[in-house]
From Swiss-Prot:
This is LexA repressor. Belongs to the peptidase S24 family. Keywords: Autocatalytic cleavage, DNA damage, DNA repair, DNA replication, DNA-binding, Hydrolase, Repressor, SOS response, Transcription, Transcription regulation. The gene is lexA. Its EC number is 3.4.21.88. GO terms for molecular function: DNA binding; serine-type endopeptidase activity. The keyword Protein biosynthesis does not apply. The keyword DNA repair applies. GO terms for biological process: DNA repair; DNA replication; negative regulation of DNA-templated transcription; proteolysis; SOS response. The active site is at 132 (for autocatalytic cleavage activity), 170 (for autocatalytic cleavage activity). SUPFAM superfamilies: LexA/Signal peptidase, Winged helix' DNA-binding domain. It catalyses: Hydrolysis of Ala-|-Gly bond in repressor LexA. Residues 28-48 bind DNA.
Length: 211
C-alpha cells in the first residue's frame, strides 16, 4: 500500500536519501528543515506512523542517530527497486596493445557493489588482458568496472576506442594537438592518437583470486 500523506512521503524520502549519501539517518532537525516542518513533535509523529506502516524500522539497541532505517516496504513505497542490480560484462579490453574488445551483448552479469549502486544502469565490466596498468594494480585477468561516459579529465583511467574500433584501458591525457593514452607500466610506451572515443571511466576493479 502506498503512503497517502505527502509529508510522510517527503519524510521517508529524505531519510532514505540521507542514508544513501551519508551512511546514517538524518537528525529530526534536518528532517524538519528538508520538508518544511518546524515542530519536532510533528516530525516524530510522522516517523512513528511510518514505523507502524512498516516503512521505517527503529532499532532500540543502536544510538539514536543510527536507530532508524528504511525497510524494503518503505523502498517500494518510494518506488525504489529492492532487487539488486547487475553489471553486464561486455567482453574484454586490453591493458596492452588495443584490440577489438567491446561486445554489444553481455557475456555474463555481476552484482553491483553497494558503494556503486548510484550508478546502476550506467556501468559495464570488461575482462582485462595484458599488463600495461600494473603500476596501479590492474592486472591481467582482472575485471574493470566502467561508468559510461564520453568525456574524461586528464589523468582519468578510461576505456578508450580508436578509429579502428580497437579498445584499451589507459590513463587519459588531452594535449596540444593529440590525445595520449598512457600505460601504467614503465616498460611500455604511450599511445598517441589524433582522434579517440571515450567509452567510460574506470571506477572499480574485481579480482577472482588473491595473487
Amino acid at each position: 500500500m502506498a503512503i497517502q500523506e505527502s509529508k510522510q512521503i517527503q519524510v521517508l524520502r529524505f531519510i532514505h536519501e540521507a542514508q544513501l549519501n551519508n551512511g546514517y539517518p538524518p537528525t529530526v532537525r534536518e528532517v524538519g528543515e528538508a520538508v518544511g516542518l518546524s515542530s519536532s513533535s510533528t516530525i516524530h509523529g510522522h516517523i512513528e506512523r511510518l514505523v507502524k506502516k512498516g516503512y521505517l524500522l527503529k532499532d532500540a539497541s543502536k544510538p539514536r542517530a543510527r536507530a532508524i532505517e528504511v525497510t524494503d516496504s518503505g523502498l517500494e513505497a518510494l518506488g525504489v527497486s529492492t532487487t539488486p542490480g547487475r553489471i553486464p560484462v561486455l567482453g574484454q579490453v586490453t591493458a596492452g596493445a588495443p584490440i577489438l574488445a567491446v561486445e554489444e551483448e553481455a557475456t555474463e552479469f555481476f552484482p553491483i557493489p553497494d558503494n556503486l549502486m548510484q550508478f546502476d544502469g550506467d556501468m559495464f565490466m570488461l575482462n582485462v588482458r595484458g599488463n600495461s596498468m600494473i603500476n596501479i594494480g590492474i592486472l591481467d585477468g582482472d575485471k574493470v568496472i566502467v561508468r559510461k561516459q564520453d568525456n574524461a579529465d586528464n589523468g582519468d583511467v578510461v576505456v578508450a576506442m580508436n578509429d579502428d574500433d580497437e579498445a584499451t584501458v589507459k590513463r587519459f591525457f588531452r594535449e596540444a594537438d593529440h590525445f595520449r593514452l598512457q600505460p601504467e607500466n614503465d616498460a611500455m610506451a604511450p599511445i598517441i592518437l589524433k582522434q579517440v572515443a571515450i567509452l567510460g571511466k574506470v571506477i572499480g576493479l574485481y579480482r577472482d583470486a588473491i595473487y
